[in-house]
Swiss-Prot record:
It comes from the Bacteria. One of its GO terms (biological process) is cobalamin biosynthetic process. The gene is cobT. Keywords: Cobalamin biosynthesis, Glycosyltransferase, Transferase. It is an enzyme of class 2 (transferase). Transmembrane segments: none annotated. The active site is at E315 (proton acceptor). It comes from Azoarcus sp. (strain BH72). This is Nicotinate-nucleotide--dimethylbenzimidazole phosphoribosyltransferase. The lineage of its organism: Bacteria, Pseudomonadati, Pseudomonadota, Betaproteobacteria, Rhodocyclales. Coiled coil: none annotated.
Length: 348
């Protein structure tokens, strides 16, 4: 996948900062909301940013390694949770309804036939990845197809008027995949070994966590640490992770704001960032997950998330919960009076 991504033009920064500073408040009094308003303005290249048709994309895919016992739940939970999303019964559905966010579920590679369903995007690459304990998770052709399909989904959202997209995922075993990706791309540079990055995922007990760590060590011994991020993705990734990476790049290409959820979503961003480092200014990091590897990822990207609520659900729930903060940042910039317009005396 080739991308022509460019970082936002910084020439607007001074004008935006002046506009923020002249609001009726002490300098910096709105804290990180001020930086967020500045970021959205730079992404949209305007002093008066607007949020249009915000949407959450939840990418679902199965993992061959799940059958080896890297998760506390059976693989069938992936398709069952997709059905739950489509029925409106999951946490992400509740939060999207509350925040008035659009929601689409993307079948990137679930081992189930859903048929044509409202709210479901059929982008299936295959019925789950191969078991990376035995072979690469996907072929180069499958990886490239997933990246391109993700890119196309983001472009389609932009064509329909969306300028802010949040990312979520569902896939039993995908915290294991995210751990391997994270270790290969940033773990060694951050002094974090694979065992440190690997967490409990869906709730493994101590014995389950040790089994997961041992299985991932076996996978790493087989596949090694490829230098090319595309090779890392093919070796250990999931179809949902690959498709998210492509969609993130596609969203940034269209000048969209990218809301980053937790550990698995950030593993997709690590791939996207390795392919196009200019993506970072487009990204709003919603929260810090309880997964230990998420802190490693955030540190590697120099990111400070908006919230720390001990979330570890995925689905894009953190992105949805952070949305009102993004709205607040844009709204104060648009609606708050300046010292001049309000006739309020400035600091002497």
């Amino acid at each position: 996948m080739k991308t022509t991504l460019a970082a936002p033009d910084e020439r607007l920064r001074a004008a935006l900062q002046h506009r923020i500073d002249r609001k009726t408040k002490p300098l910096g009094a709105l804290g990180r909301l001020e930086a967020l308003a500045l970021q959205v303005g730079l992404v949209q290249q305007t002093e008066t940013p607007q949020l249009r048709q915000p949407h959450i994309l939840v990418f679902a895919g199965d993992h061959g390694a799940a059958r080896a016992g890297v998760s506390a739940y059976p693989q069938d939970v992936t398709w069952q949770m997709v059905e739950n999303f489509l029925a409106g019964g999951a946490a992400i559905n509740v939060f999207c309804r509350q925040m008035d966010l659009g929601l689409s579920v993307v079948d990137a590679g679930v081992n189930h036939d859903f048929g044509k369903r409202p709210g479901l995007v059929d982008a299936k690459i295959g019925p789950g990845t191969a078991n990376y304990l035995e072979a690469p998770a996907m072929t180069a052709a499958q990886r490239d197809a997933a990246l391109e399909r993700g890119r196309g989904l983001a472009h389609a959202l932009a064509a329909n008027g969306c300028n802010a997209v949040g990312f979520g995922e569902m896939g039993i075993g995908n915290t294991a995949s995210a751990s391997l990706i994270t270790h290969c791309l940033v773990g060694e540079a951050r002094g974090a070994d694979l065992a440190t990055i690997t967490g409990r995922g869906t709730g493994l007990d101590d014995a389950g966590l040790e089994r997961k760590r041992a299985l991932l060590a076996r996978a790493l011994a087989r596949g090694g640490r490829p230098a090319d991020p595309r090779a890392v993705l093919a070796e250990y990734g999931g179809f949902e992770i690959a498709m998210m990476a492509g969609a993130m790049l596609g969203a940034a290409e269209k000048g969209m704001l990218v809301l980053v959820d937790g550990f698995i979503v950030t593993s997709a961003l690590l791939v996207a960032h390795a392919l196009a480092p200019q993506i970072l200014p487009y990204c709003v990091f919603a929260h810090r997950s309880r997964e230990p590897g998420h802190r490693v990822q955030l540190d590697a990207l120099g990111a400070e998330p908006l919230m720390d609520l001990d979330l570890r659900l995925g689905e894009g729930t953190g992105a949805a919960l952070a949305w009102p903060l993004v709205q607040a940042a844009v709204n104060f910039l648009a609606e708050m009076a300046s010292f001049e317009s309000a006739g309020v005396s400035d600091k002497t």
